[in-house]
Amino acid sequence: MAHHLPAAMESHQDFRSIKAKFQASQPEPSDLPKKPPKPEFGKLKKFSQPELSEHPKKAPLPEFGAVSLKPPPPEVTDLPKKPPPPEVTDLPKKPPPPEVTDLPKKPPPPEVTDLPKKPSKLELSDLSKKFPQLGATPFPRKPLQPEVGEAPLKASLPEPGAPARKPLQPDELSHPARPPSEPKSGAFPRKLWQPEAGEATPRSPQPELSTFPKKPAQPEFNVYPKKPPQPQVGGLPKKSVPQPEFSEAAQTPLWKPQSSEPKRDSSAFPKKASQPPLSDFPKKPPQPELGDLTRTSSEPEVSVLPKRPRPAEFKALSKKPPQPELGGLPRTSSEPEFNSLPRKLLQPERRGPPRKFSQPEPSAVLKRHPQPEFFGDLPRKPPLPSSASESSLPAAVAGFSSRHPLSPGFGAAGTPRWRSGGLVHSGGARPGLRPSHPPRRRPLPPASSLGHPPAKPPLPPGPVDMQSFRRPSAASIDLRRTRSAAGLHFQDRQPEDIPQVPDEIYELYDDVEPRDDSSPSPKGRDEAPSVQQAARRPPQDPALRKEKDPQPQQLPPMDPKLLKQLRKAEKAEREFRKKFKFEGEIVVHTKMMIDPNAKTRRGGGKHLGIRRGEILEVIEFTSNEEMLCRDPKGKYGYVPRTALLPLETEVYDDVDFCDPLENQPLPLGR
């Protein structure tokens, strides 16, 4: 075994050659297995456990024979027989025939008696524990589990767990019968049964991919005397890849389904029913092989188990009914078909037929979908082989691309070809995402292109109309509110508009002029344009100036009362300046109220009359005794401080009239 392991590891080419031979020899195993499978099925049905133990042994032998290519038919014929179990143990070992005679003798009974009884029980107990339903249908399920459990478990589990396989290798090498019989069924079914789902999924796919050529694969084959299958596995990385796929996709999700479903299969008619489904599911070409191998080499499948358990699982994934197929040994046998030659063919076939699988499976969709799901589940980097299992290594490559590069571009392009069903789904979903975004982008360019034309050239004529509307008071209001902006607009338009509306523009500014006292700064702003215009059109200035003169006179008349007051105020101011010799601007520092308790008196000379409660405007603080004030009527005169009271409420209002000097009078007044 040690020699075989390195040999299998060393050359994948040898495995490939073995595969080719295997393919040629498969028809023979398929023919031979066809006959024995029936009795074996009967046995499996009746004595699922013993048969299982024997089948694993027999199956490995046919597969080994197929792999070895030298005695594929003889071994197939042997497989149906009971001696094949010894051959199985022997085959994995170095000298299949001699060891078959030697080991088979000792181990076969243990395997048959032990495996069916103990391993199957263990498996049943383990499986029943893990899968109570399996326990319910112990024997139908047991056979499946021994086949799938022992062979698949060992094969797949040893494959996933290289360490497990290595222990098996020593055991198998030393005691092929025992390890396959009890260690396989007892140890592996228990430990590795679910580990198969767990380990096979994560490890087996990857380890299988790498390990099929590696020793772990050999242990697997050793467990199920398949040195040649190992070469096949090494030579057929595709097989190993599919197996990982099966172990990952099928075993993890489907192994249990298988366990649950196999009950139905085993109890209902696991072997026959499962075989037909296998024939249906496995590619049609594999079907004959599956049919033959299923029964005679149901466990050769085990030897191929890396593929077989996974194919079984794969089938389970591909179809829930296939789970029944898995439940039936036929599944395992069909798997061997895939393993022995179908793997080679099936892998290529799976490129094409795998599509069949995937397509029927698409109907079941479980297979494809589970795989896409696995793809979605990056935890299944190993499942990448699953893609290979479906579509062969090329598909596996596509699977890697599709899984790892979940990116639609890579996976969608390569995978859809390999996977008509699963990849199409995944790719289809991805493409759906793509189109959604590009459409959004595509509309945008048109929008931008449309956006550029929207420049509004017709606006220039519009402003002319606006000016016509602004000619009335509205224009003046606009200028007052936005003098700077309006002024700029008018300045820009002056060359065109001035001939038509030069007077209006100046009139607008003239309207502002009356506010020179209150708002000198705006006046300056408004006058600036008029100055510029005057420079441009000096001849018009005289007429405009003439208009300005009457306008101030015209505006006051609008308010005759105000006009009279203004005139009185101006007259009083002139008299005040002459009388008090007051020079400079008249500024109101604050307002004060005459004390209501003060004595009233008439004014005379330079003094104002005192009226209780009257409010006076303080223009100057002449001395500590008197202040120069102005009454509401506009008369000026001195008022004694004693008669004045500060207006607390008016203090803030005073700020409006005179901010700078407001502070001084109060302290002085006080």
Swiss-Prot record:
Region (4 X 12 AA repeats of K-P-P-[PQ]-P-[EQ]-[VAF]-T-D-L-P-K): 70-165
GO MF annotation terms: lipid binding; protein kinase binding
Post-translational modification: May be phosphorylated on tyrosines.
Sequence repeat coordinates: 70-81, 82-93, 94-105, 106-117
One GO biological process term: protein localization to plasma membrane
Modification Phosphoserine occurs at: 340
Biased amino acid composition, Pro residues: 454-463
Listed name of the protein: PML-RARA-regulated adapter molecule 1
Natural source organism: Homo sapiens
Lineage of the organism: Eukaryota, Metazoa, Chordata, Craniata, Vertebrata
Gene name for this UniProt entry: PRAM1
